[in-house]
């Protein structure tokens, strides 16, 4: 049995100390790192509860429950941040990526502790794949919210649309992982390639301007 709340406390403790030492300028980054890990912890409990209530098998829990719960949980702190602080577009995107990155980091650490770290090649691909998938979902939601929340008429519909896109991407990734075999490695490579392609296209557009 993995006591993920103990892992959470161990990982959050140095972040809290660093947040106190770095000052207000970097406080937002550390706070949203802690928030990202916190929503990952809560997502694990909610996933387990819903899978038990719905009597879902492993595939249904992985492909149907987990993507919805996890993407909604990652969205909630962003919506709170938008409603309370009304940040600029760049800060919205950076915050979404920070939450997603912390979420993926905590998830990977829990996976390593539960399943062991003896298979380097598998852990290497999984670390990059899962991290890139969560960051890609963060890019989609964060970049989209930065645009949608500048337009009052688009706030609600845009937020739900972005959430749906992130859930779909997450569900496809989880389905490929659950299928196993070559599809599993396709799933690990796909988000990395999409992030790389997005960065390359952004670089080319900036050079054209």
Where do the model's predicted regions map?
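Hydrophobic alpha-helical segments at protein termini of multi-pass membrane proteins
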Residues: 1-209
